[in-house]
């Protein structure tokens, strides 16, 4: 059996805290669940893990921060695994209060390098007196028992909007705690959009892999409208629950034509497009992880029409150029600086 993340190992070390029906918020490894003493609710933001949880007959799954109404006030113990973003900790604690019964125990587990010390200040605001019950595997475990439950929890109450502009195109982007580049346009995406203005795709359908909050699709929609070009459809996918929610909201507000769906990579994606575009992630939590993009590059040709274009922005130090050349074809650098590079490649036409 493969090793669990440190936070999950520490929970099992303190399994005595799981009294009654538990809720585990922020599960990152499904193999934790059968090792817990009793089943309950398991929440994950990761689409691939959600697919695994959805087939579990014992645990009730929750994809991100949209619980079923009947899950409100149903848990005796709620465990919060510390998220990367401080603002998301507040969101996760609010969900914990919604799921917990009156008098439920609230447990927070996090690694020291992930900022557990700062999170405890947030924890004490909602749980009153909190006590550290363990410290192991570079993690701390804190528990509070005076948490006031929430009778209402609406993800839309946490939604924010940011007005952005790039290459003469204005757009509104939805945001939630934990979403990439919340409240701003990251420099890599800006460079990518600028190349789209200078060297348009010239197609009517695009697939946006790792679409985040829907920035690229919203921008393409606005760019085509502003230039009087043909309408464009931009479908997108992302692995994170908040990103999928925000992208759908961004598309709805802008009137973008396209479908946003949750997926871990391309395995469940059907069809192909004349252009695929991406600003892919290279972090899992606080760790560098390029495996998702490497897998994407190995599979994306099957979703590109013959002669179709892949356009991708990435940090310049990441080793993607050779992979693009291997799986798609000759590579061109449309823009580059010390930090980012925009690559373009075309799938070879058949015959």
UniProtKB/Swiss-Prot annotation:
Which enzyme class, named as a word? Answer: transferase
Enzyme nomenclature, EC number: 2.1.1.172
Q: Which reaction does it catalyse?
A: guanosine(1207) in 16S rRNA + S-adenosyl-L-methionine = N(2)-methylguanosine(1207) in 16S rRNA + S-adenosyl-L-homocysteine + H(+)
**Localization:** Cytoplasm
A GO cellular component term found in this entry reads:
cytoplasm
Q: Which GO terms describe its molecular function?
A: 16S rRNA (guanine(1207)-N(2))-methyltransferase activity
What domain of life? Answer: Bacteria
Keywords in alphabetical order: Cytoplasm, Methyltransferase, rRNA processing, S-adenosyl-L-methionine, Transferase
Check the record and name the Pfam families matching this protein.
MTS, MTS_N
Secretion signal span: none
- What HAMAP family does this protein map onto? 16SrRNA_methyltr_C
Assembly: Monomer.
Q: Describe the function of this protein.
A: Specifically methylates the guanine in position 1207 of 16S rRNA in the 30S particle.
Q: Which family does it belong to?
A: Belongs to the methyltransferase superfamily. RsmC family.
* The name this protein goes by in its record: Ribosomal RNA small subunit methyltransferase C
| Organism name | Marinobacter nauticus (strain ATCC 700491 / DSM 11845 / VT8) (Marinobacter aquaeolei)
Protein's gene: rsmC
